[in-house]
A protein has these predicted regions:
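Interdomain motor-coupling "hinge/lid" segment immediately C-terminal to the ATP-binding subdomain
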Residues: 161-285
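Domain-level recognition of nuclease-like catalytic cores that cleave nucleotide substrates
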Residues: 447-487
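Hydrophobic positions on the alpha1 helix immediately C-terminal to the Walker A/P-loop
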Residues: 69, 73
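Pre-Walker A adenine-sensing motif
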Residues: 36-51
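Short glycine-rich substrate-engagement loop in P-loop NTPases that contacts/grips substrate
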Residues: 88-119
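Accessory nucleic acid-recognition modules appended to NTPase machines
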Residues: 8, 19, 235-407
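Structural recognition of the conserved hydrophobic beta-strand(s) that form the central parallel beta-sheet
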Residues: 149-155, 176
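Conserved lysine of the Walker
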Residues: 66
Length: 487
């Protein structure tokens, strides 16, 4: 029997999968699709259960799992599920363009779907809406009608919807989806919830992790650096455990991104592709900052700015901006033309490097500097948890990898791939500066959990526990009794 995984049984729980048949000529190819648990499911279900007259617009890079998750939840929660894909159905867009009112819009929907729309029991999923921008404007009238629920989705939404003049304020909720974060990856690989909760407790109480579990979690994190979080790639790994299959799937996604560049921005195609192709080498440089002169000796940021924005808005790249000082709010001191550019998925980044990097990561080859992939994983994790990305660099004080804001306080983070994780002069400099008033910092590495003054040394996999605190209920009623009219 083929060995499905190398992780011990006490870390594992049962995985659910379905078999899909693909008919190609006379051949039937069976492929195993694992039901990946996604955190976005909770937000989508909350929307489906709400009584608000709003639509939900789900954004995210191509192939992060938007369409699959919406279909699964829509069919599970609604008697009638209608899907219209504006990329596959070119006539659908023209039908909406010609609609003049809510009645004609709904008639067009019913005609395109070739099914009756059941009031209060129908979810209408409009996919690839970047191909029909008019529907985003028209959604206000559809949700005001109140008889049907609407979810909109598509790839490159940040790019293609920038120029819409009439975005329906107050009629749309928004949700960003990303590749699987590390916790989702752990669950996909069968790590039990009790193990994750035990690790979370260790993180919150600053207690060392059991050495056996710590060692195996590091192995799983190394696998994450190679596989990444793109659902198709994760499913391919779970089905075969074959890294060659993983790399082929990743290469396919990278090529799809490049085709999108040619299709959606042909005028700036060469600039965008050049920047995209430079990301791995720039991250492998000493300071990891994107050096503009690599693009052109006479580089002017204004000339290339839209190309950088395209990669960001398409969800392909994650810019991390330099700030002048580690003070809250960080956005006020960011420098827009000084940044690092990470890939949206660490597995895709690893696939863009040559020389069997994947094997070297998994074997822990000491001669290789894994700093770029470790930092990319950190950028990806922080982004998935809703943090804008910043770093600090100062000639006198040095550079700190990431700065985040938690509860209004700046929290610096260093990412260390080697054994010298306690060496961090720049971090020491800003912690000792009383003007910055920084109370806590993290150093993430392969070491077990420990503390030293303001610094928490945590295992790299515990990045999954860095979260924004949810706002608590704050009921406040001012005393305005003297202002009220006498009754």
């Amino acid at each position: 029997m083929e060995k499905r995984t190398k992780y011990p049984v006490f870390l594992m729980k049962k995985r659910t999968n379905i078999l899909q048949s693909n008919f190609t000529g006379d051949r039937i190819a069976l492929r195993c699709i694992y039901m990946l648990k996604r955190k976005a499911e909770k937000d989508i279900v909350n929307f489906l259960n709400s009584t608000d007259k709003k639509a939900l617009l789900i954004s995210g890079a191509r192939q992060v799992g938007k369409t699959f998750l919406i279909r699964e939840l829509g069919k599970r929660h609604y008697k009638s599920f209608v899907e219209i894909n504006f990329l596959e159905n070119k006539t659908a867009g023209s039908a909406f363009e010609n609609a003049t009112d809510t009645k004609s819009l709904l008639f067009s929907l019913s005609a395109i779907a070739k099914t009756e729309l059941i009031p209060n029991q129908t979810l209408i999923f409009l996919d690839e809406v970047q191909e029909c921008k008019e529907i985003v404007t028209a959604i206000k009238f559809l949700v005001e009608d109140g008889r049907y629920k609407f979810i909109l989705s598509g790839s490159l939404l940040g790019v293609d919807l920038r120029d819409i003049k009439s975005v329906p304020v107050g009629y749309m909720d928004y949700l960003d989806m990303y590749p699987l974060d590390f916790e989702e990856f752990c669950i996909a690989n069968g790590v039990s919830e009790s193990i994750i909760e035990n690790l979370r407790e260790c993180f919150e109480t600053k207690s060392p992790v059991n050495e056996t579990i710590h060692s195996q979690m590091l192995e799983l994190f190394k696998l994450y650096l190679v596989v990444g979080g793109m659902p198709a790639v994760v499913n391919r790994y779970l089905a075969t455990n074959n890294l060659a299959d993983v790399i082929r799937e990743q290469n396919s996604i990278v090529q799809a991104y490049k085709r999108d560049i040619s299709k959606y921005d042909p005028e700036n195609k060469l600039y965008i592709e050049e920047i995209f192709d430079l990301i791995p080498s720039e991250l492998n440089a000493k300071n990891k900052r994107f050096i503009m002169k690599k693009l052109n000796d006479n580089f002017k940021f204004s000339r290339y700015e839209n190309s950088f924005l395209w990669l960001k808005d398409a969800g392909v790249a994650l810019p991390t901006y330099c700030v002048d000082e580690p003070r809250s709010p960080l956005a006020l001191s960011k420098t827009k033309n000084l940044f690092k550019l990470f890939m949206s998925d660490v597995g895709l980044l690893a696939s863009m490097y040559m020389n069997d990097l994947q094997v070297k990561i998994l074997s822990g080859e000491l001669s290789v500097n894994f700093g770029s992939v470790y930092e990319n994983a950190a950028a990806q994790e922080l982004t998935a948890h809703g943090f804008p990305l910043y770093y600090f660099n100062n000639k006198k004080q040095g550079e700190v990898d990431f700065l985040t804001e938690i509860n209004g306080e700046v929290v610096p983070m260093e990412i260390k791939s080697g054994k010298d994780y306690t060496v961090h002069s720049a971090l020491n400099n800003i912690l000792s500066n009383s003007e910055y008033n920084i109370n806590k910092a993290y150093v993430f590495s392969t070491a077990n959990l420990s503390t030293d003054g303001k610094i928490v040394y945590a295992p790299i996999y515990m990045l999954m526990f860095i979260k924004k605190h949810e706002p608590k209920d704050m009921i406040y009623r001012p005393n305005i009794s003297r202002l009220l009219a006498n009754k």
